[in-house]
């Protein structure tokens, strides 16, 4: 089980990303638009830099929904390999069968 503080911090980052997503996208569009004057684009870059660091989507860490574990994460199932193995052996995941040959 992951530390509650780490899981809560990640949730706070997700909230910030959601809050600033629209503003960040608009500033990025201005900064990357080559038809605009250089000063305007540079100003947009400065405004983008002033936004909170944790408002960038890259700061979100994929964590297991069951345990909060940050590593060995399967995106499709939103869980770690440890939780997958545990729930799979209990028969909690439909369609998952232990392989045998």
From Swiss-Prot:
GO terms, biological process: translation
Any one Gene Ontology cellular component term annotated for this protein: small ribosomal subunit
Keywords: Ribonucleoprotein, Ribosomal protein, RNA-binding, rRNA-binding
Source taxon at top rank: Bacteria
One Gene Ontology molecular-function label: rRNA binding
Family, as annotated: Belongs to the universal ribosomal protein uS14 family.
HAMAP family xref list: Ribosomal_uS14_1 (MF_00537)
Protein's name in the database: Small ribosomal subunit protein uS14
Gene that specifies this protein: rpsN
